[in-house]
Amino acid sequence: MEKPRPTIEDRGPGEPALAIVGGIHGDEPSGVRAVKRLLDADLSLQRGVRFVVANPPAVEAGERYLDKDLNRVFPGDPDSSDREERLAARLCAATDGLPTLSIHSTHSHSEPIALASPEYPEAFRLAAQLPTPYVVDETPAVDGAFTACSTIVTLEAGCQHTDEAAATAERQARAFLAVTGALDTPAPAADPSFYRMDIPVEKPPAESYSLQVANFEPVSEGVVYASTPTEDSSLNGRSFRSSYRSVATRRSSGIRDQSSAIRSPKR
């Protein structure tokens, strides 16, 4: 049975005290590029840092995943017959107890977004210190994500396959290193808004789709927030209307959810 393993490189003094992870999804190269750039930069690290490329076969193939979505099977099972289940278990073990930044990218949103679970207060505190405009608790709407594994901060760095997303990923990773004391540089200013994902709205079965509203903007009851194409590829085939006042978001796997703002000044 194949034993898939993440690619791991430890840098800095002593045992690893934190981790930076890219490549959970193989079609999101910004995190992998950020990891490689940081390794090539030969940083003067003040603490041990574990750099990880999570899913090398998917990265090499340029595919989101090969068999199962890795970011939906955590914490995984080391004895499972499914390769992603085994890989998830190894990734959890490699980052166990380490504050971790996991870097992703999206199809739609160019601004960075931090996601963390309040079940891990340290992760939520770290997310709030990153220079991102939004911090999102996705726990109620997403099962099996890496954020549920430990002290994990997920970063959506921007649009997939763009140089801007790779540059943002590196900047945010450097900010994470500064916030955690691994780099002896001032941490950048942060003042995010906080959101919580509440109700999952599955992506409709279609080759393509259109989000009709802006990310993180309020959606009034009755407003069309998304549509799918007809056979002639127009974007009026099927419309989806909000049944309540909410905030719509879209992530790389499609139109996923509606979110409600939570007001919390806590860091």
Predicted regions and their residues:
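Structured catalytic-domain cores with a bias toward divalent-metal coordination
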Residues: 1-267
